[in-house]
Amino acid sequence: MDNHGILESLLFTAGDEGLDEKQLLEILDMSKDQLVELIENYSSHGLMIQRFGTTYVLTTKKEAATYIEQLIEQKSQMKLSQAAMEVLSIIAYNQPLSRSDIELIRSINSDGAVKTLIAKGLVEAKVVNEQRSQQLITTDLFLNVFGISNIEDLPTTEEDDEEMDAFFSNLVNQKGENND
C-alpha cells in the first residue's frame, strides 16, 4: 500500500477527531515537508484532507455538501443551548478567558454551559502564562465544527473589534488590573 492509502486509512480510522500532525509524522516516519506534499497530491473522488489547527482530518469535498445535508438533515450532531452558544462565542472571540471573566460578561453563572462545551470537546481549560486560574480556549474540534483553519478566520467587523476592545478595557479596569 502506498503512503496515500496509509494516510487515508489512518485519517478514516481517526474519524472526526482527526490526527495531530506530530502523530502522523511519527506513524508515517516522514518529514513535515513530505507530509505536506503527500496531502497536496492526495486526490479521491469524494474526499479530501483538511487541516484544522495542527490536526488533519479526512473530509468530504464541498461538491458533495448538498447531498450530505440531505442525508443528515434530520440529525443534529452538535446541539447546544442558547447559553452554551453564548459562552462559546465569548470564549472564541476573547480567548483565553477564565470562568469568572465569562460570568462578568454574562452576569450569570455559566458553569453548566462551560461544562457542556468541555464535554463536547469544543473548549478546554489550560493554565496560560502562569495565571492562577485556568483559562478557557477553543480546541481543534471547534475549528473543525465551524469549518475554519484557525481562530483568526472567525467572522468579525471593525466596529465589533472596537466595541470588544472598549468592553474588555472597561472589564480590566473594573477588576482593578493594570491595562499595560
From Swiss-Prot:
Source organism superkingdom: Bacteria
Keyword Acetylation: no
Keywords on record: Cell cycle, Cell division, Chromosome partition, Cytoplasm
Keyword Cell division tagged: yes
A GO CC annotation given for this chain: cytoplasm
InterPro entries: ScpB_csome_segregation (IPR005234), WH-like_DNA-bd_sf (IPR036388), WH_DNA-bd_sf (IPR036390)
Broad class of the protein's primary localization: cytoplasm
SUPFAM superfamilies in the record: Winged helix' DNA-binding domain
GO biological process, one term: chromosome separation
Subcellular location(s) of the protein: Cytoplasm
NCBIfam families associated with the record: SMC-Scp complex subunit ScpB
Similarity annotation: Belongs to the ScpB family.
Protein role: Participates in chromosomal partition during cell division. May act via the formation of a condensin-like complex containing Smc and ScpA that pull DNA away from mid-cell into both cell halves.
Subunit field text: Homodimer. Homodimerization may be required to stabilize the binding of ScpA to the Smc head domains. Component of a cohesin-like complex composed of ScpA, ScpB and the Smc homodimer, in which ScpA and ScpB bind to the head domain of Smc. The presence of the three proteins is required for the association of the complex with DNA.
PANTHER family linked to this entry: SEGREGATION AND CONDENSATION PROTEIN B
HAMAP family (alphabetical): ScpB
Name of the molecule in the record: Segregation and condensation protein B
Native species: Staphylococcus aureus (strain JH9)
Lineage: Bacteria, Bacillati, Bacillota, Bacilli, Bacillales
